[in-house]
């Protein structure tokens, strides 16, 4: 079982601009399912004849999709910052990023489920073994990235207020920060209940805008061909870097995914679920890039048009009702992101000795929330584009070194080695493993008998 409620906060409050809170209800199902599974077995990956239903594979994959396609994605700023400037290579780089992300999540879930690990701390200790203390590198990345996400949510909401009502951006930051603080203290439960519908609405409206925008402009093929004719393969190095960087900062959702992925009790199930997620994520991201490429000449020429390019394009198409629906949903979604993420921060940090001197719990929570929001507001002064370009970007560089590369090299090796030594952890019986091995290598009579209890080993 997961060790404590605190561990769940640390895994779940990553539902930032990268994760709309409407995934919370689905995640709760996985938590209950996975914990029940762990109670009945020595390890989640044990001998089993039950076929994992497709709906479960799809649902776990959809959690990663919802983590990616949140309010930050819906603004269009992330796609503009990392892919539109690459021209025809933008969609290629985006597909590569989603492949890296899903492969990393697959290895992480496989490592957790095969060994019965109970936290991302144990996961990274296993990954980095014998250098166990390096697990703190992910902790550093995680908290910095989530703080950036809160700042991006405040900045995005303030930018939306500026676009719709002409409100001064800095006044908007103060107003949004105050609203987030009040909701965190008094209305977090209400926000969590409403966020399900807000998240669904923003995703549907954003995809609708992307589809209509591509058809409305009608010049996508011409834009791609023109860019290829002028740039050729000159942007390949930058495309590769952006591919890894984007996948890197999206790894902030890893704690949520290993929690939701506990029902995936075989290696094949982990793989299938992540391939489903890869298709969903790649299609959505490429669709947004295609739309922005089609309209790049327009929204880059508008003052402030690159901050929320999706809104800029929507206005130009003259679809007033869609513009209003999109704006309301985006604003509420970003606010809920700020509230739920701040609430998770409060639950984690109010236990520190620094704040224990405040005996009255509500006052202690309010002080911690105020500190976090003031810090996030300070960061948001840099503007949404700078937060995504530099804040997310440097976190992405860091994650390449501490998450992506380790999981896709050492992680792959350790998982394969562990599954060879513990065939039951792959969802096969020992007898089935022996037969498979004998069929592949007839000269060998048997396999080493695996331990009856799947101990948490370093490799």
Predicted regions and their residues:
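Hydrophobic, membrane-embedded alpha-helices of multi-pass small-molecule transporters
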Residues: 52-74, 143-146, 212-218, 225-282, ...
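Juxtamembrane transmembrane-helix boundary signature
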Residues: 64, 95-121, 291-298
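Extracellular loop-to-transmembrane helix junctions
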Residues: 51-55, 81-109, 277-286, 393-404
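Membrane-interface "cap" regions at the ends of multi-pass membrane proteins
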Residues: 28, 41-75, 236-243, 262-268, ...
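Hydrophobic alpha-helical segments and their helix-loop junctions in multi-pass secondary transporters
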Residues: 143, 180, 201-230, 292-294, ...
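Transmembrane-helix boundary/entry motifs in multi-pass membrane transporters
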Residues: 46-56, 84-90, 114-145, 163-169, ...
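Membrane-interface interhelical connector segments
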Residues: 292-320
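Membrane-interface loop-to-helix entry segments
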Residues: 152-161, 168-175, 183-214, 388-407
